[in-house]
Structure formats: structure tokens, C-alpha cells
Amino acid sequence: MPKRLPEYAVRNREVWTVSNANYTAASATESWAQDEITWGRWHTPESEIKVLPQLRGLEVIELGCGTAYFGAWLKKHGARRVLGVDITPAQLDTAREMNEKFGLGLEFLKANAEAVPLPDESFDMAFSEYGASLWCDPDLWIPEAARLLRPGGELVFMRSTDLEMVCSADTERIGTQLVRPLKGMHRLDWTDDEVGASTEFHVSHSELFQILRRAGFDVLDFRELYATEDAVDHPYYQYVTAEWGSQWPSEEIWRAKKSRRRPGAPAARRRAKKT
């Protein structure tokens, strides 16, 4: 990992050190013990939405892995190798403890997902569930994911929806009114009395689509998720209620494939057939 992290990464590392002590370390055993893959705060089953590629035999890098419970699920469902990358030592300590306890053979690397010290084209799939997809600059981490993927490899990530972000006030729970512009959003600096100051990144769908295309990705799938019928408010991440999430999508999943052609190169022209 480079000696100097961006200032927002330093703040986010401090926030996740506190969050690990307050919640994620205590919840890690239950998450790692789970066999079913579920998505986000509403635990939407992968068996219902079927957005992941076939995992059997894949080498996967999780960018912003936290305690790496999702990486554990990927390994249980057939991934040959899973490497988790994160900048927060406390989160990685918890992940290593869980890995030893459950014996799944995950690997871990302390590094910034915007600049991972690994060779080009090392993985078949890059993944992030509220990791790099939320806490890193998309203009940096998405091209980095592309660099790490082999041609034809896939990027799958979950983040907040446009609607959630424009309805989220600085200090209150989400509401039903637009409180901030989507245009020019990109970076949001938050202050929380419990965990401290943090920085998230969010760009609109059209901007994100262009970032993916510039990095050499073709978008394969896109899903917006609502709270499930039996969903309840999350015990720790309480800024979005189940009631709100049952009416409007609060989470979204993107799946993209690294093109086998050079980023920015035009597709081969086809000769017109004579009639």
C-alpha cells in the first residue's frame, strides 16, 4: 500500500475502526457461519435475484472487504481463490480471525482499493458490496478493478441508489423529500457523533455507466433492490428504514464484463453484404 493514503481514506479507516469495535467484529461469526449468499442491509437472497456469475473455479478479489463475510460466501459457493483487500487493520484482524475459525482459506491484503499492489490481469472477478463501491473514488477504483481483471473477467458491486442519496440529509434518517442535488454529487462528507467524520462517493447512473465504459467494461446487468417483505430496520445501519426501503429502492447491483478489446478502441467494423 502506498505510504500516503488520501485524506478521505484516512478518515474512513478511523470510522471503520470504530465500527468494527461497535458492530462488525461482534456480528462476524454469525455472518461467516451463513451458507446462503444474501445482499445488503435487507439480506436479499442471491437465489432469488441470480445476479452473480457462475463462481466455480474463479479467482476473486474483494475490494474493500471489511470482515470478508461476503468473500467467505463466495468461497463456499465455489470460488477457487478469494483475496480480500482493505485499509482498516481492525477489520482485517477480524477477517483473519474468522478465516482461521472457519478454515475457508481466504487471503488478505492491507491496501487501498484505488491502488492495489498486485500484477495486471490476476483475477477472474472483482467484487464489492458497500466496500470500494461506496468508500473509494469511482474514477480511481473502477479502472483499478479493470487492471486487475483478466480479459473477459467480471466486476460485480453493490452501492446505494441515486434516490437514497438525494433523499438523505446530513444528520437525519432518510426522508421522502429531495434534499440534495444529484448533479455534481460525486463526494459526500458526513459527520456522525458516534463514529466520526467519513467520506462516501456517489455518481449518477449515467456518470457511472460512462466510467465503466471508459475503463473497458460492458454492462451486463443492473438491479435495484427493495426491502424484503419481512425486512426490519438494521440494528446498526439505521439511516434507511425498512418502511422507506419497501417503497423505494435503496440498494443497487451492477454487473459488468471487461471487454477483450483495448479500452477506448472502436469495435471492429463489419463489412456490409452485397444484396
Predicted ranges, named:
Residues 114-125:
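A short acidic, Gly/Pro-enriched loop at the edge of an enzyme's catalytic core
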Residues 61-115:
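Class I SAM-dependent methyltransferase SAM/SAH-binding core
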Residues 125-139:
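A short SAM/SAH-binding and catalytic strip from SAM-dependent methyltransferases
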Residues 199-222:
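Short alpha-helix
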Residues 1-31:
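N-terminal, positively charged/glycine-rich alpha-helical extensions of SAM-dependent methyltransferases
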Residues 31-58:
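Conserved alpha-helix/loop element of class I SAM-dependent methyltransferases that forms part
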Residues 154-188:
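Conserved class I S-adenosyl-L-methionine
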